[in-house]
């Protein structure tokens, strides 16, 4: 209670909190933690640190077993910030603050959102709690339960190729069910929880040039969805992976983590190529049970302009306007060699559909994959 001793957490409080984590394990129930405290009661010395350590261990043990939601309603300081950030979803009130070791920097909800720490920022504490309730209502109780199913009405918006990522997601998913996470952070990726045909799904839209932040944003979300067997629907319009600050080796490592997240996921995975899928992006996002493409998609190992230089360079020799011809040849390459029809011949695409039919195709595909089961080689986890 922030009104009593600044909400300082004592050893007795910590033991009380740890008991709730134990109950969540025994009952397979989601855990919602509300933070509004100025930190630990430091006068208790090492004892309070040991108690906090028990809570952090319990939170780690609970990860992937039941959904954990952190609601930052006020101050969230020090080890409490560590605990909040270990949750699956962090919801912050607009006037709340979160920092670990130094209060001199920007600890506002806006800063946490910009840094990708806060998944959702709400107007006030009451709205944050309401959002946590909504999350609990759409997520499975635990990793052995299925997500709630409800009647899903189609959105009134028509699917169009030129739509913004979040608008396309809203048009395909059930009306008024899209809950975007980490909005405004790493804009090359849009992630959301929603329902399609009444069932909860995780939706990813990858666009532009995927960089370190967007790849990590997607990878973390895919792992979260896989933990609770939520199907993952991925829309792809990626021109390739960009170098991170000019360090090409770092880009390769981060891209490999993204590819691993998709490869490791055993939940139902559907990929829809709505635009470009160039190079490693086509491979990483293409690790799915069903790969669908719109007719105008471009799926290629190289960008069309680069491919023209490699494969059709002879056609450029002696051209009066080489730049213009290069553009024309790149367009031709995209429509022929890099078309989804060629990808289908190479077994990289299972179905090519009219964009207007995207929602109905996804509903059918999700029904088909509902009973998917995968056995893995025995191991603790990927290294």
Predicted regions and their residues:
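Ligand-binding clefts of soluble mixed alpha/beta catalytic domains
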Residues: 1-383
């Amino acid at each position: 209670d922030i009104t009593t001793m600044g909400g300082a957490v004592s050893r007795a409080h910590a033991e009380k909190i740890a008991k709730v984590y134990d109950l969540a394990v025994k009952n397979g129930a989601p855990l919602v933690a509300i933070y509004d405290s100025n930190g630990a009661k430091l006068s208790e010395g090492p004892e309070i640190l040991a108690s906090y350590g028990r809570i952090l261990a319990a939170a780690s043990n609970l990860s992937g077993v039941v959904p954990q939601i952190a609601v930052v309603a006020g101050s969230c300081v020090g080890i409490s910030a560590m605990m909040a950030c270990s949750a699956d979803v962090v919801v912050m009130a607009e006037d709340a603050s979160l920092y670990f070791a130094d209060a001199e920097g920007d600890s506002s909800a806006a800063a946490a959102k910009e840094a990708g720490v806060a998944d959702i920022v709400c107007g006030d504490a009451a709205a944050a709690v309401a959002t946590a309730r909504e999350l609990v209502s759409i997520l499975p109780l635990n990793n052995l339960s299925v997500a709630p199913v409800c009647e899903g009405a189609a959105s009134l918006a028509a699917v169009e190729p030129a739509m913004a990522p979040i608008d396309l997601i809203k048009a395909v998913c059930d009306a008024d069910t899209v809950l975007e996470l980490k909005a405004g952070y790493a804009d090359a990726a849009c992630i959301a929880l929603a329902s399609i045909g009444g069932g909860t799904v995780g939706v990813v839209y990858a666009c532009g040039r995927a960089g370190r932040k967007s790849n990590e944003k997607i990878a973390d979300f895919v792992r979260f969805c896989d933990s609770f067997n939520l199907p993952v629907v991925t829309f792809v319009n990626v021109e390739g992976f960009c170098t991170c600050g000019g360090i090409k080796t770092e880009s390769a490592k981060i891209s490999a983590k993204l590819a691993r997240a998709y490869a490791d996921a055993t939940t139902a995975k559907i990929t829809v190529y709505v635009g470009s899928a160039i190079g490693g992006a086509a491979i990483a996002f293409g690790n799915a049970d069903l790969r669908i493409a719109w007719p105008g998609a471009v799926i290629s190992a190289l960008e069309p302009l680069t491919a023209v230089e490699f494969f059709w360079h002879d056609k450029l020799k002696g051209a009066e306007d080489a730049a213009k011809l290069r553009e024309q040849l790149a367009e031709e390459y995209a429509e022929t060699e890099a078309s989804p029809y060629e990808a289908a011949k190479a077994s990289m695409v299972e179905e090519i559909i009219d964009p207007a039919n995207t929602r109905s195709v996804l509903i059918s595909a999700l029904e088909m994959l509902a009973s998917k089961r995968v056995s893995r080689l025995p191991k603790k986890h990927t290294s």
